[in-house]
Structures are given as structure tokens and as C-alpha cells.
Amino acid sequence: MNQEIMNLFNPTTPAQVFDQIRISIASPEKILSWSYGEIKKPETINYRTFKPERDGLFCARIFGPIKDYECLCGKYKRMKYKGIICEKCSVEVTLSRVRRERMGHIELAAPVAHIWFLKSLPSRIGLLLDMTLKDLERILYFEYYVVLEPGLTALKDRQLLSEDEYLKAQDEYGQDSFTAMIGAEAIRELLKGMDLEKLEASLRVEMQETDSDIKHKKLAKRLKIVEAFRHSGNKPEWMIMTVVPVIPPDLRPLVPLDGGRFATSDLNDLYRRVINRNNRLKRLMELRAPDIIIRNEKRMLQEAVDALFDNGRRGRVITGANKRPLKSLADMLKGKQGRFRQNLLGKRVDYSGRSVIVVGPELRLHQCGLPKKMALELFKPFIYSRLDAKGLSTTVKQAKKLVEKERPEVWDILDEVIREHPVLLNRAPTLHRLGIQAFEPVLIEGKAIQLHPLVCAAFNADFDGDQMAVHVPLSLEAQLEARVLMMSTNNILHPANGQPIIVPSQDIVLGLYYVSIMREGLPGEGKIFGDMAELEHALHAKVIHLHTKIKYRWQGMDETGKVSTRWIETTAGRVMLGNLLPKNPRISYEIINKLMTKREISGVIDQVYRHCGQKETVIFCDRIMALGFYNAFKAGISFGKDDMVVPHGKWKIVDTTRTLAKDFEQQYNDGLITHGEKYNKVVDAWSKATEEIAKAMMKEISATKKTASGADADINSIYMMAHSGARGSPAQMRQLAGMRGLMAKPSGEIIETPIISNFKEGLSVLEYFNSTHGARKGLADTALKTANSGYLTRRLVDVAQDCIITQDDCGTKLGIKMRAIVDAGTVVASLGSRILGRTACEDVRDSSGKVIIKRGTLMEESHLDAIHQGGVQEVKIRSALTCELVNGICGKCYGRDLARGTPVNHGEAVGVIAAQSIGEPGTQLTMRTFHIGGAAQLNEQSFVESNFDGKIVIRNKAIARNSEGHLIAMVRNMVVAIVDADGTERATHRIQYGSRLHVDEGDTVKRGQRIVEWDPYTRPLLTEVEGTIGFEDLVEGQSISETLDEATGIAKRVVIDWRSTRGGSDLRPAIVVKGKDGKVLKLARGGDARYMLSVDAILSVDIGAKVAPGDILARVSTESAKTRDITGGLPRVAELFEARRPKDAAIIAEIAGTIRFGRDYKNKRRISIEPMDKTDEPREYLIPKGKHIHLQDGDVVEKGDFIVEGNPAPHDILAVKGIEELAAYLVNEIQEVYRLQGVLINDKHIEVIVRQMLQKVEVTDQGDTDMISGEQVDKIEFDALNEKAKEEGKKIATGTPVLLGITKASLQTRSFFSAASFQETTRVLTEAAVNGKVDPLEGLKENVIVGRLIPAGTGASMAKIREVAMKRDKLILDEREKQAAVVSPAPEAELPALPPAE
């Protein structure tokens, strides 16, 4: 009885406790064990009584009562009859909730195939039986018989027979001499009769014997599925169903609408079809109907079951009454609207509201303004409870009334309730974790939420109508997490790069910039002030100006913490700013005693955060915000038309460029340059002109003008806005007052005629049209970009979601080397910036060999100076890529938590942070693919200047002096280095083939001196020997054509594709250099002086011409060598993460050796490499014709050199150079795209993602393990199996790492939940079921899906505590068992001492 009473108040059944979930194929017995009864009728509910029909789809006898504790006929009502089964209507008296849990079943009259195992590729049934899908369908859909048992006849096992052949065979051999069947029964018999163990053994033998690659792959696939069935305990015949489960009725409800109609779930329709056809089939079989009718009915039953499980996978989609496809069971799970993504991974929550946001400049950083109306609604339950506690109301109803009337005491209580109760603000789209932050609410009038201006950058919010959502954390734990982890004051640094994100912008920056200006010659210059009061007095009395240069007695703090005083030259404005700085010995006045631009302010905030901590930083930020706003208002900076100054020299520059463009046109007409070259040169000239005009304009605008009295005049307002970083950029100013410049077409090409006017002068009609042309594409791009960027983020999160910091140190000795990234001679990422916050993997030594940083040290800002001064060129650091933990990453390999500036904590979800950091700036990236030629990424570099003073050192030197007396680079791998006085290398430049050097080995250079230059638009072919020119196989009309440029009538000789001309297939066009005797000269490196020509080469020499080494024989315009598009922006990032092979992939030399040209095929050229290492095999490469090969016979290549230029395929880099090189390549390429947009992302984020892409190993030799060579195995699994083999003394397997794209890697994670909720749900679940996969619930997604705390953050520590508790429980239970075993009435043994808590 007591139990019953207890149940009254606690009707919930305890949740199942589990730590793994397994998925497998359900056997017919299993389905029957779930079922509470068979459904025999297709009826749902009675149209008059609205009660469910007996044995129908909603039957109360099978599924349970409709009302709580009430049977259908109403004989038994209420709790006291709980558990009784009514004798009249056979309904159990219980909770109606069981209708959500109880299942039914349908006994099928004929077996049917489960469509997922039949049609989901690869077809599992087909693989097991080794039959094609086409044949299977012919059997299943009753077209062909299949021979099961040929007996003594001439038929073969599993031979297909058509109706006629079957009858003929019966006539010929007699009815019982062989067995052949048709339909699902036949397949079921075949599957039932399989001996998997025997099959596995024979497949293994066959695999060892076969030589064919294709056959090996096919056998491996089959072997894998056979093993899967053997190990999972699934039986193959279960893929053919004899019983169909029916899901509980409340999960496919029938809802009455007003007007007496019903809305029903599509599943009911689908089940109805199955039941109808099944019943009809039963009746026909009882009636002994003709075979043809029964067969047709069986086929229809198969189709009905197919539609129920996966509508539209086979045949046409079954539609409902309104021509809409019915939603089958598979559709319930699939896609954005499916169960996984709609309800399990994304839920709507209560206690939330949303409203428009407005600016709240008087708020503190940790506050937000919450409208009273919203607060009242959100905190209602809290208010009710307080009213009750204070005795102001006795019932909830009374409290409700009080609140509705908005009585004064309610407002007082609301104040109490929200005090120190943080709320979460969220702005969609939440692209990174800073899109949700916690604030303390401040009650305000009005209906809009007030937001602090400094957090706008993190939310990416502005006040043009943005809305934000408010969520209330209810439980104490939630409030604690909100306050400790999510409070806006805790999110000062950006997780992507560790820079401050609480940075003033726009008017604040403008105000601070204005405050910090210093001008010469203003009243009161040179006056001396002792303290702030004097200064303010003087300002009010207008004795001095805010910008006057003055002397001030500054009180700072020295190293000991004592106050120190000194005189400084500054301005009144800067003193105001200095007074806001926290007092700290490491923070000097100098950091603000300069013109404060946005960048400078960010630097100051960073310094304050590093030296003074979070609290001081927050106070400082609030103060400078107030100062900035106030002074922006005081300054009265405006935007006037006269502030846009059109430079005086504009038209002169325009005219010169016009003449230049005319010259190029003329050169083209004279045939000196090609059309492509002319286009490039014209575009270049106009780019330069635009730049020059912009420079002239900036010079005029930024120049300090003098007033009549000789003082500095006010600075130009527009210049102030752009220079301070408040709004606008030099590029926009150029369009306002310089010239608009070149415009792009929607295709990305650049229009040759520029827009010469600017917006101040106004555009002509033609110019206006040209400018709208490209701008429209920009808008269309933006819309596409958002979707694409979101999808990239989703894939990244999915691949990295289970990357969590699980330990402090994995103890690995591995790491990756970091160097500064130098692009075209300028350092784009210094060594210091790349290793900050990472752990040293080895001792770092300076150039003298002294250890300056010990291994295992986390690099702080202080270490960077030591590295810089020590002249260290590269540092080996720990990386996520080389971390040896099985699950997750260790803290040492990850390094510093960028958002906190401290070593990373346990349980930090670094994978998700990495994904967000890379995905969030995705919307800022461009979408376009650049076509070469055009100012989009022009300013092609054509020279290198020295950035340092020093001496020249040349490595791999090969220089020739050509007939004009210039030094020419003759090899591709020559490097020029600049070494300073100490012998430290300051810069290295790789020199292009054919470049002209201005310096030689040992020369001294000054900073800014030109070292080399080259023609960026052509690739030359140079001779290495002196002699006379001869031609080989250059036949007019076959391999060479004198093309007359149609515009000019001037001839130039171009090599044409000789293989496509008649009789030209055997030609090998070349230029040879002959000696005095008329014979072809020999080269020093071996081989003849014969230079093969590629298609589109333009000859620069004639027969009989004299040449010197280094002279150009022919040139290939890079137009044709480089017509490939440069994929830029988002598509490039996606391409790299997906590890796609680029369209024109570079061909990489797998070994070091000598190039040899072999015999050519019809449309391929054969190149082989003779290895240096004689034990190696030579490698052959086939290269499509028309590809420009810049190597000659006899050239020496290193391992990893490019044989054909292009983007290398990441897989090739991994295969040839290994993981470290691959990581370096991917990190640099991805960073380059982001760098172009000025987005900073720390390398470690990209490394985390790349680590996830390298989780698989391809087995090359299976050894004595169960693995199959050629299959891809998880690294962890691979190591585990090898360990096992080692212990047993067997031969271990070998494998090579494989690079998977992020989509593929997500689908191949160990967790099937995670993969199924990502993409291709059916395929993933089918495969998981066949393999009987177990999901260990280790990642974040799986745990969210099953409704648990995620194993990261606070969830990780909870998991740890739970683990300890379970260990202790086990100890106690074991001890109890021991005591129970000792039956003797001895005194109870002491309980064991508990292990100390971890």
C-alpha cells in the first residue's frame, strides 16, 4: 500500500542508467518481444464515438488507455483499479502515458526485404550474396526465379530463370529435380543457408591469391561485411522481415481539428497501406488464388513496406491526398527537420524572451538593461515564490492577480529577485561562443533591451534594428556557470587569437583620438602643471587648449611599488587619458603618450589585461568608453564636402597613364606584345595611377596646415575618422576624393577602362554603369556567402566536436618546427607571434648555443624578446597534431587558452572552439575565384629588395652572364640569403629561374637595395651554353605557326599543339645549341643542349643566331601557363579542409634524382626520375600535353619538388613529405586566405582540425591481424590490434596515415550517433546496425542527443567525480559481499578505508 501512495506523488519511472548504446538489426523474435499485440485492422477510430477501433492502429487493448486510469468502456475509473484488465473491453487500467511507449506488430503473410539493406549503397544483401542489385530486384519484385538447389540438373547454383525458362526447366528435368524460388522468400532462403565462417576463410584465401587490384578491393568489401555479421551476432536472414513493428500511437497521433476533421501523421497512412495489402494477401492465399494474383499482391506488399520505411527510395514516391509525399520513418530522422537536428540537437527553451536592442552607454560592462515588462514575465515563478514567502499572497492564483495588476510591492520584489541573478543574452547568428554572454540585469523603462557598447563587437551587433534573446538560468549551478564562465567581464580576449575583443570602436575611438592629438603653436604652449586640478582650471579658463603641448608632473609607480615622479612633455588630453590607467610598475605613461588610434587602444587594453588582471581592465575599459564618448561629442567632428580634397596633380597622373596605355596599344598593334600582355600592362598602369593619386590625396589631406597666427590648424575631419580607425578606410577616401579606379566584372575579370572620376566630382553615365556592373555581383555573393560559411562551420564543428583537453601532459617527444612566415621578402607572421602561448618541445638555444628556454616551458610574452635577441630562426613546439593521447588532447600540446591567457584547463572543448574560430570569420571572406590578370590581386611582384643591411650568401649557386652582361639565375632552387654582421640569417629569398641578379656572392647590401628582378608575365627558357641556334622538328603548320596578329599584321612564331596536326604525332619540337663544328653541344650535367618546347611557347631567337649562356631562347606567357583560376576566400578554405584534389594538381617528385624524358604517348608525355639512391625504383609520371613542364632532361630534383607547377594535392604532400610538412602546408594555405582579409586566427585551431583529419590509417600489410589490407582503420584501433598481435607474438600490421576531408572524417567517427546526426543518416545507421556498433558516448554530440551533460567543461569534472564515486561504491559492495560470504556470526568487519578523492 505504501508503495502505491509513494507512486501517487512520484509517477515517473526512474531513467535507465547506461554508459554505452548499441545498435543492431532486430530479429523477428525481438520485434515480437517488444510488441503488446498484433494489429489486424487498418481502422483508426470510430467515426461516431471517436473511440479507437479494436485491433486497429490505435487499439486501446494493445497500446493502453486513452485517459489516465480509465478503461475504454468506462467500467473501471480512478487509481484504485490500477493494473486491472477490464473484462468487457480488455483494456488495462493505467496511465495513458504508456501509449507513448507500447509497440505493436504486423505479422506479414509473406516475407519482405528491408529496403535499407537492399537499396542503401552499397547494398548489404547484394554484397553478402555477391549478386548485383539489379538481379536482387528482379528476384524480389517477382520477375525472375533463382535456383537454390540445382540437384543433378545442368542448372547452376543461384542462376536466374525467367518465367518461361523456369517452366521449360520443369518440363525438361521434372518438377522435383531442382529447387527454384522467387521473391523475398528466395532471398531469405539464400541468406539463411550461408555459412559465414566458411565464406570468410575462402575469401581470405582468394584475397591472398588474387593479383588484380579491383578484385582485391571487391573481396575486401565482401570480407568486411561477412566479418561484421559474424562479430555482431546479427543473422543475415534478419535483413528480410517477417514481422513489421508498429510504433506507439502517441508518436503518430490523430488530432481532431475544429469542423470535425482530423489531422493525422503520415505514418498512419503508410501503416494502413501495409495492413490492407497484408490482409488482402492472407485472404487470397486462403482462397488459393492464381499464382499471378498472389505474386502481384506480394509485390505490392513489398512496395508498401518499402514506403513505410523509406518513401521514395525505390520507385515513385507515395503521395497523400494533397499530392504531398508522405513522410516515412526514415524521413523522420533525416535532414534539418528530422528528429536529430530539429529536436535532439536544437531545442526551444522556456524562460526566454526577445526584443530590439538599443545602446546603453551608462551601463557598466557587466550589466544590461532589461525592460520591466520583460523582467516581470521572465521571473514570474521567482516573484510568486517571494510573494508567498513574504506572506503577501497565500495562493498562486492570488500571486498571479497581484502580478497582473502590477502592484507597487511587486516591483520591489522584482528588484530583489533579479539582484545578482545573471541573465544570458544571445544574438543570432551565434557564430562563436561570444554570441551568448551573461549580464546582470538593470531594470529600465521602455520595451527595448539595452546593450553595453563595448560588447557589440563580440555579438557583432549594431543598433539598426537588431534583436536579441534573453534566457534565464534557473538552477543555482546554471547561475554559477553564467557568472563564473559567461559573464561579459570574463570574455575580454578573443578565443580565436587572444587579442582583446572588448575594444572601443567608432565614436569612442574618434573621441580618444581627438583627446590625444598634439598640435604646435597653440596658446599656452610650454606651460608647466603640477596636478590635474591646475590643468582643469587652465582648460576651463581657456588658457590652454586640449591639444597644447605642455609639461606635466606625472606620478607613476616604480618596480618596488613606491610612487615615483617625473616630468613629461604631453597634452592636457593625454593626461586625462593617463589618469585612467591603473597604477602598475609595468604600465608606463609612454603607452598612451602618443596619438591613440584603434590599434593603439587595443594594445593598451592588452597590456593592462596582461599586467593588471581582469578587474582593473574592466574598470579601465568602462572609463575610457566614457571619456571617448564625451570627447567625441565635445569635438564636434563633422563630415563636410570640403574635407574631401581632390589632389592637385590628379589630371597630370591621369594624362600620363593615358599615354602609357596608348603606347601599350601601339606595341600590341606592332606585334611586340600579345593581347594578354597588353591587357596585363594596361591594368597594371592604371592600378599604379590609382595608387599614386591616392597617395597624393592622402598627402594633401593629412598635411598639417598652419593658421594665420602660425599655429597648427585643426586636422581634416575625414582624415581623422579614417586614420583613427573609427570609420572608413583609405580605400574609401580614395573613391571619395581620388579616383575610383579599376572595376571588376561579375566574372571577376577587371575592366580595362578605369573610372577616373571620384564621388565628389560625380561619375559619367558610362562610369556609373561600369561600377554597378561589379557591385551587383558583390551583393549576390554576400547572400551565398552566409549559407556557405555556415555550412563550413557545421562541418568543422562536427569533425572536431570530441576534441577535449583530458590530461595535462601526454609526455610525447614529438613536435613541429615553427619559423617566421616570409612572403616576398616581408615577414607576414613573425616567429614570436606564432609560438606565443605554445610549449617548447626541445631546449631553445640562441645563435651561440646557449639554452635560453628549457623544454616544456610555456612561451610567455617575456620569452619572445629573448628569442628575438638570440637570433633564433626556428623553434620546435608541441602541437595538437603530435599529441599522443587516445581520447582528446593534452594541455601541454595545446598550450595557452587564448581566451583567458593562462594554460588551458581540463575539459576545455578545444575542438569546438577551433571550429568556431575558423568558421566565424567565414562571412568576411570573399566568395570569388580570381581570374589571373586584373587588379584584384595585381601588383604582381617583379623584384626583391633587401629589408636589412648585410652580406649576400647564395646557396645552390648557378649563375651565367648573358650576352647583355647581366647575371642570370640558371636553376630553380637557388636561394639568396642576407646575413648580418653576427652571421645570423636575416632573410632568405628563393630566386625564380631566369631572374636577373644585381648582386653576387659576398656583396654587401644596404636596406632597400634591389637584389633581383624578373619579368612577372613570362617564363623564360634559357640556354646554358654558348653557340649557334638550330631548330628541330619545328615544322611550319605542324608544330609551329607564324601567327599574324589580326589587329597588327606582325608575325610572331608560336609553338602549336603538334600532336593534333596531321602527321605531327611523332614530332618533338626543340631548340638546339650547336658548336663551331655544327654538332649539338653537350651540357655539363650530361645530355645534349637540346631544349624541348611546350605548346604556346613564343620563340625569341632565329636559326643561326649566336647566343651566350643565360640568353632567352623562348618564353611562355604566364597567361597561358597560369590560366588556372586562383580559388580564393571561402571556397579555398573549404577545398583545403575537404582535402580535395585541385583541378590542375601539381605533380610532386616522390624521390630525389635526375629527370629523364621517355617516349611520348599520343596525348601524354612520359617523365621518369632516376633515383640518386640506387636501391630505389625509378618513378614514372605521365603528364598531359599542353601542361608546361619547366624541367629539362638531366635536371636534378629533390624529393618533394614540383615536376609540374600547380596547387599540390594535400594527399601527395602527406605521402611524400609526411605529416609535419602537410600540416605546415595546410596551416599556411588556410592562414593566407584569412590574412588577406586581415583576420587573425591562431595556428593551433587549424592544427586541431587537421589532427581530426588524420585519424585514420590505411593498412598496407595486414600481418597476422584481423585487418584487411587496403581498408581504412581508426588509428587507435590499429594500434590496439597491433599491441595484441605483439603480445601473442604474431606479425604486426603496417599502415600509412590517410588524410580525410572534414565531411568524410565526420561520417567515419567512432560514434554513429554523431555521424547520423551530421549527414547521410540512413547510410550511417544501416552500416552501424550491420556492424552491431557500440557508441561509447564520448563526444559532445552523442551526449546532447541522449540528454546528458556533455563531457566538457563542468560536465567533465562531474564525470570525474562520478568515476571516483563508482570506484568507492564498488569497494563497499565488494566488502559487503565478502561479509555476506562469511556466514559465521563473527563481529562485523570494519568497512575499508575510502580511497582519497582525486
Swiss-Prot record:
Its EC number is 2.7.7.6. GO terms for molecular function: DNA binding; DNA-directed RNA polymerase activity; magnesium ion binding; zinc ion binding. Pfam families: RNA_pol_Rpb1_1, RNA_pol_Rpb1_2, RNA_pol_Rpb1_3, RNA_pol_Rpb1_4, RNA_pol_Rpb1_5. Zn(2+) 2 binds at residues 810, 883, 890, 893. InterPro entries: DNA-dir_RpoC_beta_prime, DNA-dir_RpoC_beta_prime_bact, RNA_pol_asu, RNA_pol_N, RNA_pol_Rpb1_1, RNA_pol_Rpb1_3, RNA_pol_Rpb1_3_sf, RNA_pol_Rpb1_4. Residues 1377-1398 are annotated as: Disordered. GO terms for biological process: DNA-templated transcription. NCBIfam families: rpoC_TIGR. This is DNA-directed RNA polymerase subunit beta'. The lineage of its organism: Bacteria, Pseudomonadati, Pseudomonadota, Alphaproteobacteria, Hyphomicrobiales.
